[in-house]
Amino acid sequence: MESSLIPFSTPLPSRRFLAIGTHALSNKMLELIAKLSLAQHVTVLDCGNRSNMYSAAKLIRPYTSDPVRVMCNIRLSRAFTCYQVLAMLQAVAANPPKEPLVVLDLLATFLDEDVELKDAQRLLDHSLGLLTQLSNS
């Protein structure tokens, strides 16, 4: 692996990691997803609908002769609303993946001005509870 990708060993041990940052962090998260997908399946929940999988494909291409197979290791789900984020997390929590789970832009849809603040808070609390449940599984 070239040093431009995030350095770590794959497959990942069964530990949980949390990365929080500005939208600029998304490039590093795509590097993480690309690196993980070279060695194993990875589930990606894009809660802000901002991830660019073409960028992930470009990162993967130099490291494999079969980028399509590697891209098939990425299981991507996108949410456009905070209601969809909750539904997505409920579906994943009902059948937790054995592979790494990457959640991108969790808070993005909860800031929607078309959603009442109390509803957004309730949905966020429920979503955080599901993430806690997933981290313990």
Feature locations, PLM:
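Pre-Walker A adenine-sensing motif
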Residues: 1-11
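Conserved P-loop
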Residues: 12-87
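Residue-level signal for alpha-helix termini/capping positions
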Residues: 34-38, 93-97, 136
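Loop/turn-to-beta-strand initiation segments
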Residues: 73, 98-101, 136-137
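Flexible beta-alpha connector loops of hexameric P-loop NTPases
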Residues: 75-77, 113-123
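Short amphipathic alpha-helices and their capping/turn segments at secondary-structure boundaries
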Residues: 85-101, 128-131
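Conserved P-loop NTPase "ATPase switch" module shared by AAA+ and STAND
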Residues: 97-113
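Substrate-engagement module of ASCE P-loop NTPases
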Residues: 121-137
